[in-house]
Amino acid sequence: MANLKALLLRIKSVKSIQKTTKVMQMISAAKLHRVQQKLENAKKHLLELSSIVDYVPSDGVHNCASIAKKERVLLVVMSSDRGLCGNFNNLIVKFTKSYVEKLESSNKEVKLIFFGKKAYDMMYSQYSDKILNVFSNTKSITDFLYFKLFVYNSGIDFDQFDNVMILFNKFYTTILQKPDAQQLIPCNLGIPMLLKEVYQYEPTYVDVLSTISLGYVLNLMYIAFLENSASEHCSRMVAMESANRNTKDMLNRLALEYNRSRQASITTDLIEIISGFESLN
């Protein structure tokens, strides 16, 4: 009887877990859909910025992609604040470690900034001397405006570095996400030397280009952030789907074990009743 009660408690517990994983899977699917819409809009915005740059003359403008020597490198690492998303964070941590080793082998000074605390927690013990800061609570970023405020309030000074890279899990499809690196600074805008038309700029085209370049870099960061968020939600959705399947298999095994134990208990009770009846006769 005690064994049957224990099995019933396990079945109840697994059913509760199954409900939780199912809800988390549905929530992740809904969040993934919203992030995909934001990602599509952000890419359109980046395309518009790129087209504007095509009309800015480059004579006399310092090209931000013409830095000859790169000595100090900042890696902005995107991860998640929460777990239960498969190997999502493990992939970006492994990719970051490999990237750091490659840069240091080229005699570069590497510093790290983390968006999302999971990768930070996994790398702190080994790279504590290279970490400048970590920013958690990234779920509060709901749109591009909040993202800009988040970056400004973070106090990141890109001017201290010759090269700034952002490392994130790039979203390709719902079944394919891979770690990727995107260069932020120098920002390769690809400004043409000759233009078909000439425009006048206020106050100067240097200021115009500077403003556009800043917007371009922020937009690249925002797209990487959205790509990483989409990959996180997709990984969590797949992980919860797998967990849901496992709970179904476990429930089937527990139900079979419960029925066998119950049948054995009933058989034992019947044998005892028959034996008692025979002893009375």
Curated annotation (Swiss-Prot):
Membrane topology (UniProt): Peripheral membrane protein
A GO MF annotation of the entry reads: proton-transporting ATP synthase activity, rotational mechanism
Write the record's keywords in alphabetical order, separated by commas: ATP synthesis, Cell inner membrane, Cell membrane, CF(1), Hydrogen ion transport, Ion transport, Membrane, Transport
* Family annotation (InterPro entries): ATP_synth_F1_ATPase_gsu, ATP_synth_F1_gsu
Question: Which superkingdom?
Answer: Bacteria
Q: Cross-referenced Pfam families, in alphabetical order?
A: ATP-synt
Record-level GO cellular component terms: plasma membrane; proton-transporting ATP synthase complex
Major site of localization recorded for this protein: membrane
Quaternary structure (record): F-type ATPases have 2 components, CF(1) - the catalytic core - and CF(0) - the membrane proton channel. CF(1) has five subunits: alpha(3), beta(3), gamma(1), delta(1), epsilon(1). CF(0) has three main subunits: a, b and c.
What does the function comment of this entry state?
Produces ATP from ADP in the presence of a proton gradient across the membrane. The gamma chain is believed to be important in regulating ATPase activity and the flow of protons through the CF(0) complex.
Indicate the family of this protein.
Answer: Belongs to the ATPase gamma chain family.
- Give the protein name, as stated in the record: ATP synthase gamma chain
Upper classification of the organism: Bacteria, Pseudomonadati, Pseudomonadota, Alphaproteobacteria, Rickettsiales
Q: Which gene is annotated as encoding this protein in its UniProt record?
A: atpG
